A protein has these predicted regions:
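Beta-propeller blade termini and top-face loops
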Residues: 18-170
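Bacterial Sec-dependent N-terminal signal peptides
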Residues: 1-23
Length: 170
């Protein structure tokens, strides 16, 4: 009885192992596809490059903002092909959250200080806002909170902003 089960299983697995479509030369990755990408450091900490938060512009799906745990804030205008740091001149390097104002997609809210507890954690300097898509930043307070985990702009009132903060770890 077992012989009858083994043969169909063998035929089935043999069939699916050869059923993949062969790649065309035009489908293969070429070095020219990667010309816009360059290797670069994304942070100074032991575990750099940790994405803390991401925000995508609801009015332009190609424009993204990324808050990096130990690497500042990055922006892309081409869906991630290339990235530019947009807060390197600020007094913080650790970020925890980033939010696009639902009333004005050029207004970006940033919570500094990654909201984790570990040897790699970086403290922040409160909340910052940019009125021009990340070109300039203004401190809005809560400097002693050190770790901002979430910012929500009220959908009814752009002047009401809710903030969640862990507070100092030590």
């Amino acid at each position: 009885m077992k012989k009858y089960y083994i043969l169909p299983l063998f035929v089935f697995f043999l069939t699916i192992s050869f059923s993949q479509k062969k790649k065309n030369a035009s489908e293969e990755l070429k070095s020219s596809d990667l010309t816009g990408l360059k290797f670069r450091s994304v942070g100074p900490a032991f575990m750099s490059g940790r994405i803390a938060d991401i925000a995508i512009n609801p009015n332009n799906e190609n424009e993204w903002y990324v808050a990096v745990g130990s690497g500042g804030v990055w922006k892309t205008v081409n869906s991630g092909t290339t990235w530019n740091p947009i807060a390197d001149d600020q007094p913080f390097y650790s970020t925890g959250c980033i939010t696009i104002d639902p009333h004005n997609s050029s207004k970006i809210w940033l919570g500094t200080g990654e909201n984790v507890g570990g040897r790699h954690v970086g403290i922040g300097h409160g909340i910052y806002v940019s009125e021009n898509g990340g070109k300039n930043w203004k401190s809005m307070g809560l400097k002693n909170s050190e770790h901002i985990s979430k910012i929500i702009v009220s959908p009814k009132d752009p002047n009401t902003v809710f903030v969640a903060s862990q507070g100092p770890l030590w």
